[in-house]
Amino acid sequence: MKKILVLHGPNLNLLGSREPSIYGHASLTEINGDLIQEADNAGIRLSCFQSNAEAELIQAVHQAGIDKINYIIINPAAFTHTSIALRDALSAVAIPFIEVHLSNIFSRETFRHHSYFSDIAVGVISGLGTKGYLLALQAIIKELK
């Protein structure tokens, strides 16, 4: 069975209550549930992990390599603009990934315009809200089939 890992970065545990005008009203639990259901329908195993700690996300990426995960969907959140270490972990395991952002990072503050991940990602989805996760998953399902 094919396996996908969804990684959520810092503060995404607050989705649903954190700045809903920017990030929407859906909780992380709701987003994960929708993704798991969509993957199940396609016969793919999907697991989700969220952490506010960079080291834990890096360890999850390392474990994904050991577990032979086929694809990663990642919303690095604030680590998008700061984490060379998380980028290096993704490069090291060589698992293809799609970078997702709920908001359009290019229409926000200037410091959010740079991503340490976009140039090594298979694709980037930014600004489509929670639909971005689903679109990433649908693209991966098509590729894995």
UniProtKB/Swiss-Prot annotation:
Where substrate binds, per the record, is at 75, 81, 88, 102-103, 112
* Active site per the UniProt annotation: 23 (proton acceptor), 101 (proton donor)
Task: State whether keyword ATP-binding applies.
Answer: no
Site entry (Transition state stabilizer), positions? 18
Extract one GO BP annotation from the record.
Answer: quinate catabolic process
- Which Gene Ontology molecular-function terms are recorded? 3-dehydroquinate dehydratase activity
So which residues are the signal peptide here? none
- What are the entry keywords? Amino-acid biosynthesis, Aromatic amino acid biosynthesis, Lyase
Reaction catalysed by this enzyme: 3-dehydroquinate = 3-dehydroshikimate + H2O
User: Pathway membership of this protein?
Assistant: Metabolic intermediate biosynthesis; chorismate biosynthesis; chorismate from D-erythrose 4-phosphate and phosphoenolpyruvate: step 3/7
Q: Which Pfam families does this entry report, sorted A to Z?
A: DHquinase_II
Enzyme Commission numbers on file: 4.2.1.10
Disulfide connectivity for this sequence is none
Q: Which InterPro entries match?
A: DHquinase_II, DHquinase_II_CS, DHquinase_II_sf
Provide the family line: Belongs to the type-II 3-dehydroquinase family.
Q: PANTHER family annotated for this entry?
A: CATABOLIC 3-DEHYDROQUINASE
**What biological function has been recorded for the protein in this entry?**
Catalyzes a trans-dehydration via an enolate intermediate.
Under the heading HAMAP family, the entry gives: AroQ
Instruction: Give the record's subunit note.
Output: Homododecamer.
The protein in question is named: 3-dehydroquinate dehydratase
Task: Give the gene symbol.
Answer: aroQ
